[in-house]
């Protein structure tokens, strides 16, 4: 069932057609827009006496009092059994299925950048299998090489974002492979698998920061730095940076690769932002949207 539009408008329309007692969802950490949307949905549910049940996703802990116990909570969550999929789903009579928007729909605004990965559950399983079975053997060796890393990195991030696979599921697959590995160089192979487990933890760590302190989308983590840069933007530097024309060969090569493919390894992405912030002295709140 698919609907597009304001979530409150969609729920109001459904409420006129069906008796809604509960809404089940996963806990999402997005940006200020999704945060405000979630607040509006919670208020709407209260007004209409509807239960809103949200399930944790990956290693993000909602309403965390402090960070001291985060790692312990996350690791325990990753060890839990996978929730089995339902044997069957009872369809709701009379509900319209809705249509999937086409890629040229106005709701997407700008054209897609680079090469868009295929979506779907089957594709997620295919990608993680090819990584664990073969591509991971050179993961750490190639992680800082922008061109080669396109093939030896996991490439599973979009599927984690859209929920076609979970961190818990990947970790269990990694552990299973480590225990049953028949690789010739098992020590190196397992080191690579441990490295991707570490990256999965870091992914949760960074998202947890945004969950706990959503203001960092717009403000520096340390308030002292908020006024460090002037309000005016050096548009000449910004244009050169985003087009890969700074004159720094490695920086420009990485940016051009990013613009063409729509993806670059996390390490190179961090380098591009660091170069913009420290060498070009550009405000991260502007460059972060590129």
Predicted regions: what they are:
Residues 215-250:
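Helix-loop-helix junctions that connect adjacent transmembrane helices in secondary transporters/permeases
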Residues 190-197, 267-271, 286:
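Alpha-helical scaffolds flanking conserved acidic
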Residues 5, 28-30, 55-60, 164-165, ...:
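An acidic- and aromatic-residue-enriched active-site/binding cleft used to recognize and process polar
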Residues 1-87, 182, 256:
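Trp/Phe/Arg-rich N-terminal binding region typifying the photolyase-homology
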Residues 157, 236, 240, 249-259, ...:
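Contiguous, well-ordered alpha-helical segments that form the cores/surfaces of helical PPI scaffolds
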Residues 35, 54, 264, 281-290:
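Short conserved catalytic/interaction loops centered on acidic-Pro-aromatic/His motifs
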